[in-house]
């Protein structure tokens, strides 16, 4: 009998690519199924993700997957909490503009989350230091 060698990394990459191409992660507004919204904490963009991030996100990811399997149209966005003095201080320490420092960290964290197989709706990603995002926060506070 021939021995079969499994390559988990290749299998994972294959299916993640297919699921993303099929739009499995994305909820459509015109979908007639019952809608379910789920949000996890937004990681702070101070550097690499660590086990504490995934410890907090894994239950949300599992619940969103479960609801998809139950037939719900699940909105499960991700975002990055990107404002704060620690990010600015780290950027200054590394001689990098704070916005570049933050966006580089966002890119790295996005890649890490995708590698872990998180099933977020990447089309609904929010970065809190993006003017297109925080203009709505400012608008809301002005309305209070």
Give short role names for the model-derived ranges.
Residues 1-144:
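N-terminal, positively charged nucleic-acid-binding surface of large information/translation enzymes
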């Amino acid at each position: 009998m021939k021995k079969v060698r499994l390559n988990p990394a290749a299998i994972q990459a294959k299916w993640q690519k297919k699921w993303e191409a099929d739009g499995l992660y994305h909820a459509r507004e015109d979908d007639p199924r019952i809608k379910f919204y789920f949000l996890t904490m937004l990681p702070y963009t101070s550097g690499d993700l660590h086990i504490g991030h995934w410890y907090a996100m894994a239950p949300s990811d599992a619940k969103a997957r479960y609801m998809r399997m139950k037939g719900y149209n699940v909105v499960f966005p991700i975002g990055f909490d990107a404002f704060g003095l620690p990010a600015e201080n780290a950027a200054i320490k590394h001689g990098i503009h704070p916005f570049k420092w933050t966006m580089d960290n966002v890119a790295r964290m996005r890649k890490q989350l995708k590698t872990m197989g998180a099933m977020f709706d990447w089309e609904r990603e929010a970065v809190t230091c993006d003017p297109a995002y925080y203009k709505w926060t400012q608008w809301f506070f002005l309305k209070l």
